[in-house]
């Protein structure tokens, strides 16, 4: 199976998000890469489901809370930008202050 670099990036992001979900389920606090991966995967899956950019910008702020991440992580992530594939093409989704 041949994958493009973009497809490889998506698979890596999905794998990191899956790991983050498992760690959250065990009661662990997420670090920076896990937090970014989980929110990014949420946005990409929402785009695939047909949600609007505006809806994902708002919903992306409620994926994680401060209590679910390590100390200092919310300040390290002022915004997250994800190029997601929507039914009508690729669009850039920006989530400001994603961990509240």
Swiss-Prot record:
Main localization category: cytoplasm
Gene Ontology biological process terms from the UniProt entry: urea catabolic process
Pathway(s) of this molecule: Nitrogen metabolism; urea degradation; CO(2) and NH(3) from urea (urease route): step 1/1
One MF term in the entry's GO annotations: nickel cation binding
CDD domains hit by this protein: Urease_gamma (cd00390)
GO cellular component: cytoplasm
Source domain of life: Bacteria
Group of enzyme by EC: hydrolase
Catalytic reactions of this protein: urea + 2 H2O + H(+) = hydrogencarbonate + 2 NH4(+)
InterPro entries given in the database record: Urease_gamma (IPR012010), Urease_gamma/gamma-beta_su (IPR002026), Urease_gamma_sf (IPR036463), Urease_subunit (IPR050069)
Enzyme Commission number(s): 3.5.1.5
UniProt subcellular location: Cytoplasm
Alphabetical keyword list: Cytoplasm, Hydrolase
Quaternary structure note: Heterotrimer of UreA (gamma), UreB (beta) and UreC (alpha) subunits. Three heterotrimers associate to form the active enzyme.
Family indicated by similarity: Belongs to the urease gamma subunit family.
Xref: NCBIfam families: PRK13241.1, urease_gam
Name of the protein: Urease subunit gamma
Gene that this sequence comes from: ureA1
């Amino acid at each position: 199976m041949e994958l493009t670099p973009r497809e490889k990036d998506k698979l890596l992001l999905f794998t990191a998000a899956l790991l983050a979900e498992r760690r959250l389920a065990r009661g662990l606090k997420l670090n920076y890469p896990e937090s970014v991966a989980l929110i990014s995967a949420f946005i990409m899956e929402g785009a695939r489901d047909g949600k609007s950019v505006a809806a994902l910008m708002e919903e992306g702020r409620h994926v994680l809370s401060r209590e679910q991440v390590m100390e200092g992580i919310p300040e390290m992530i002022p915004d997250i930008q994800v190029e997601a594939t929507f039914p009508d093409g690729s669009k850039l989704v920006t989530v400001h202050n994603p961990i509240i």
